[in-house]
């Protein structure tokens, strides 16, 4: 093996899924979405005797990548899924989805208008932390997303992502050591709060929250600064820490946050425990 050759992946070539609806899938991706059909493989099995004969067809999905489908000839269709709205009702099935990037908010709304004009049920726009999206389903029930970037990712995003996953792994290890499971994201947030407190050399017993110094969370920090009972510090270049001697309380509508951002509000880390958390109000108290 040539160790002098640097290894680098150059992007996603294609994604693939099975389909039991040949005509409908072709018409949806080629005609409704306007993706050119660029390649088809037809084969008698693929080695193992148990592998059925199949068609494997590819649509151009932009920037040199394709989206592909396997159509297995004569194979029984799995239990038919009922017609589902473009909302994540089946979290396991819907976790597998394709998201296409568009260039602007105007383009995103234009896609929504075009799809609805063709009879496709489309979700309302959903603002996440760094993207805004619409969702719909193909004839197989697969989730499809079209999204626009709200900002570019920064080094802090990568650092915060690594801390979140480190906290999740630690929380799972602690739970496994006690024959338990991590069932609530609060456990991960609390572990991340402990990690960040240790890295900053401080003791944060709560109620307190670490807030990444990112634009989507700026209204939380601003609201805390205007509350005389809250203390705002920056113990780390990438994080603010909001603390109080009493409970911390925030209102989603007053902060101007969309639901998808609101429900991930404590991704920076939590000191204490969440006493109340509904669609508009959160209250954090001492552990």
Predicted regions and their residues:
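Short, surface-exposed ligand-recognition loops at beta-strand->loop->(often short) alpha-helix junctions
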Residues: 101-105, 207-216
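Short acidic/glycine-enriched loop/turn segments that link adjacent beta-strands
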Residues: 51-53, 128-132, 238
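Short amphipathic alpha-helix segments
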Residues: 213-227
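Short glycine-/aliphatic-rich beta-strand segments at the starts of folded cytosolic domains
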Residues: 198-210
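Core segments of cupin and vicinal oxygen chelate
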Residues: 18-72
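Helix-rich interaction surfaces within compact, conserved domain-sized segments
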Residues: 237-239, 246-287
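Vicinal oxygen chelate
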Residues: 1-5, 11-21, 58-62, 82-199
């Amino acid at each position: 093996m040539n160790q002098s050759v640097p290894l680098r992946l150059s992007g996603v070539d294609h994604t693939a899924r099975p389909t039991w609806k040949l005509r409908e899938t072709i018409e949806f991706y080629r005609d409704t979405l306007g993706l050119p059909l660029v390649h088809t493989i037809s084969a008698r099995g693929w080695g193992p005797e148990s592998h059925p004969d199949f068609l494997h067809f590819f649509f151009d999905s932009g920037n040199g990548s394709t989206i592909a489908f396997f159509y297995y000839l004569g194979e029984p269709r799995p239990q038919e899924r009922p017609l589902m709205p473009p909302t994540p009702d089946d979290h396991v099935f819907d976790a597998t989805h394709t998201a296409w990037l568009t260039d602007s908010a105007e383009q995103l709304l234009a896609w929504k208008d075009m799809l609805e004009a063709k009879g496709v049920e489309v979700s309302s726009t959903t603002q996440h932390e760094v993207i805004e999206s619409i969702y719909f389903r193909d004839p197989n029930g697969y989730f499809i997303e079209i999204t626009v970037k709200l900002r570019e990712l920064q080094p802090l995003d990568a650092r915060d992502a690594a801390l979140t996953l480190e906290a999740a792994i630690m929380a799972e290890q602690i739970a496994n050591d006690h024959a338990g499971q991590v069932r609530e994201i609060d456990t991960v947030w609390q572990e991340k709060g402990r990690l960040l407190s240790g890295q900053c050399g401080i003791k944060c017993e709560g109620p307190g929250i670490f807030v990444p110094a990112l634009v989507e969370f700026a209204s939380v920090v601003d609201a805390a600064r205007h509350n005389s009972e809250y203390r705002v510090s920056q113990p780390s270049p990438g994080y603010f820490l909001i603390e109080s001697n009493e409970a911390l309380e925030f209102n989603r509508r007053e902060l101007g946050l969309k639901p998808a951002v609101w429900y991930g509000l404590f991704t920076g880390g939590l000191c204490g425990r969440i006493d109340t958390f509904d669609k508009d109000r959160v209250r954090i108290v001492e552990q």
